[in-house]
Amino acid sequence: MMKVFKHIVAALGFFLLGSGLSFADTPKPQDVILTWYGLVNGLVRHTPTYSPPVAARAYGYLGVTVYEAVASGSDDLQTLAGQLNGLKGLPKRESGKTYDNSVILNAALASFTPIFFKNTGPSGLGAFAALDSRLTHQVIDGMASDVVERSTAYGKSLAAAIIKWSKTDGAGGDIKNLGFDQSLKLPVGPQYWVPTNMLALQQKPLLPWWGKNRTFAIPKIDDCKFDPPIPFSEDKSSEFYKQAYEVYDVGNHLTDDQRALALFWSDDPSLTLTPAGHGVSIAMQILRRENADLEKTVDVLARLGVAQADAMIGAWHAKYTYFLLRPVTYIQRLIDPKWDALLMTPSFPDYLSGHSVQAGSMSVVMTKEYGDNYAFEDRTGEGDGLAPRSFPSFNAAAQEAASSRLYGGIHYRAAIENGLKYGKCIGQYASDLVTRK
């Protein structure tokens, strides 16, 4: 337990060092946001149920929380209530009264985070409390008591409203068995998913109901279309066999760079930030690099959060529509029984690639915010010993993230390419949200 706590605190310390913020500074409102996000990134790695869809959902609601906290007192930003599915009736600031954004944000995030990470354990809860205490002392220093009380109360009421909204999205309450539904009856046939490891809990796939959750920005998940998978066949002349053989052949002849990028984008739960957290990490690096103001910060985090949350709903909708077997299963059955992928195959169906859908959604949002040819360096994996990678654009980063699943032996090409296109469609709905008055 203490080891986990130290890892969380270390993650927060690494974030603070990279951002140039220390607790000796008086934080700006955007510093408050990014500091809490830094802690959340650490917690995603160490909270048992935080699989990729669950993490994406949390980042979605987190982004809406910080956005609405700022929009409620902004002359330029307008609320997302009425634009996001089911979001309405948010509390308002009292007209003519003085509020402080830093106090509101800290109170909202200190209320939101322990609810979404309540099963992170005593160490994680201790990290929340420590950060809340430190930031609270900083943001209220020298402030009139009535402003502190009013701002704190508003932040807490806003967080309560967002949490109430989140409870109606279909994701359910506590996730049992880490999300592996032991009651699920698996379809039977040569084309269907079967377990890819020997872990008892993972003999059933992850979160089979997730694709039915309420979306954020896209009205209905079927509003974006994707091609069905290639017709299943065991014939060596078939397209399906050729795509499986490609995974096999590529995996047997990986270059050093292909191996490196497969590991860079692996984004495994319990070890990394997950795909959505990786996308958020990229955004945070750029927000710091650009010294983004408060309104830009919350706009980017809200759009990206809801885009990636919707992307995971869409990917899981596709996965459990087709229940397609993984490449490792097909290859070991028909090509080489001793073959294994570079990366551990996740315990859920192949089609579509969740990484690809997420990456596509991220690229659309970030390209709208920063342009088609925004070059950047991604240092997300640096704390894990992974060298930074540089990209000429967000689309290039998304393409590499998607392709990494071929090099890792995780997905067929069709799941990757169609997933990327599908994710870009989903991301467009978040990109089209009206945030400026």
Residues covered by each model-derived region:
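Regulatory/sensor and coupling segments of signal-transduction and defense proteins
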Residues: M1, S19, I282
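Bacterial N-terminal signal peptides that target proteins for export
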Residues: M1-A10
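Bacterial N-terminal signal peptides
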Residues: V9-S19
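Acidic/polar surface patches and capping/hinge elements
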Residues: F23-K437
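A general structural signal for short secondary-structure junctions and capping/turn motifs
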Residues: K3, F14, T152-G155
